[in-house]
UniProtKB/Swiss-Prot annotation:
The keyword Cytoplasm applies. Keywords: Cytoplasm, Hypusine, Initiation factor, Protein biosynthesis. One of its GO terms (biological process) is positive regulation of translational elongation. This is Translation initiation factor 5A. PROSITE patterns: IF5A_HYPUSINE (PS00302). Gene3D superfamilies: 2.30.30.30, Nucleic acid-binding proteins. Functions by promoting the formation of the first peptide bond. The modification Hypusine is found at residue 35. The lineage of its organism: Archaea, Methanobacteriati, Methanobacteriota, Stenosarchaea group, Methanomicrobia. InterPro entries: IF5A-like, IF5A-like_N, NA-bd_OB-fold, Rib_uL2_dom2, Trans_elong_IF5A_hypusine_site, Transl_elong_IF5A_arc, Transl_elong_IF5A_C, Translation_prot_SH3-like_sf.
Length: 128
């Protein structure tokens, strides 16, 4: 799910969709309006799910999509290799995700973990 906002309403640390990917805004720079033009904004962001750096350049009055990012908790049901089966603690639905190598030793069966969901993608949100 996503919604539209004007570029001038964006803030650092919030989310934005650039190249059909949910991103976290790292910096926003705005230029002054010229004699015949509108102010421009440059948004630097990092992909929430892939970690790639992306940028957007456009008028401050332009509208841009912002993803609706949800943080939820789930219980680890089973771990098979690098695939983990989780059950959402809110609606009790089950789903499987691939766990990155750096998180494999931090999750155990029966524990609760938090995860992020946006634009139909899911990512573990394990904070150390």
């Amino acid at each position: 799910m996503k919604q539209q906002v004007e570029v001038k309403e964006l803030k650092e640390g919030k989310y934005v969709i650039i190249d059909d990917e949910a991103c976290v805004i790292k910096s926003i720079t705005k230029s002054k309006p010229g004699k015949h033009g509108a102010a421009k904004a440059r948004v630097e962001a990092i992909g929430l799910f892939d970690g790639q750096k992306r940028s957007y350049i456009g008028s401050v009055a332009n509208k841009i999509y912002v993803p609706i990012v949800e943080r939820k908790t789930a219980q680890v049901i089973s771990i098979t290799g690098d695939i983990t089966q989780l059950m959402d603690m809110g609606d009790f639905s089950t789903f499987e995700i691939v766990v990155p190598d750096e998180y494999k030793d931090k999750i155990k069966e029966g524990e609760e973990v938090s995860y992020i969901t946006a634009l139909g993608k899911i990512k573990l949100d394990i904070r150390t």
